[in-house]
Amino acid sequence: MISVNKVFYAHSERFQMQNMNVHIKAGEVVSLIGPNGSGKSTLLRLMARLLKQSEGDIVLDGKSIHTMKSADVAKQLAMLPQMHDHQLDLTVKELIEFGRGPHKSWRGRLNKEDEEIVDWALSVTNLEGYEYRLLQSLSGGERQRAWIAMTLAQRTNVLLLDEPTTFLDIVHQLEVMELVKRLNEEFGMTIIMVLHDINQAAQYSDRLLVLKRGKLQYDGVPEEVLCHEMFQHIFGIEVDIFQGSEKPFFTPKRISKKGGAKCEQKNVLPLS
């Protein structure tokens, strides 16, 4: 579906991404985790063609992404960046209609199919009845769902989300994560997201990619990646790891001075 092949990228002397190799399969939910400045958002922006690597290639559905027309990329891949303008003088429906941009005719008007897709995006994100509300009048969670609805209106197979739960309270975080789960399970969307909440990443993802200083350090299912060595190596903390009903989760204990190593076994504590 989307592959990052031997990519090199540097935006300053202090940060370099070297020989990055990632392959995302169709239908996967993949979360990028790691400390601040590790390259998570940079990797996502490279995949979205918002940044251009100096070496290597990024392939979307068999085609080099930098040889494709922008409109063709936008028909296959949508990205919601971390920050958006919440003060736009737009209604929810007007915002969502922007998602139809890559599909519009040269006249720029919405046809019947466009209107049906906008209505579908409103329905999927539980925003029916909000279409004529101004963005400024919405709660944080409602606004985030409106922006996600705009990306859904592109009708792509791949959705990139950069910290979609940042600045939201726990209820609205769970609303967004449950929406991500539904988009994957009901509509088969491939979803790649940057998350700071590692427990949420483990709960809602098929795979975790762990970055540090521009390098991919761990790549695997949550049960394998969430181990004591990873937390020591990547975050410099000691943790307790528990096995939930489906996925593992952790609680932090203290800052660690140990270096960490590879996760060679499942260091999981049973729930009492």
From Swiss-Prot:
GO terms for cellular component: plasma membrane. Its EC number is 7.2.2.-. GO terms for molecular function: ATP binding; ATP hydrolysis activity. It holds the Pfam family ABC_tran. The lineage of its organism: Bacteria, Bacillati, Bacillota, Bacilli, Bacillales. This is Petrobactin import ATP-binding protein FpuC. The complex is composed of two ATP-binding proteins (FpuC), two transmembrane proteins (FpuB) and a solute-binding protein (FpuA). It comes from the Bacteria.
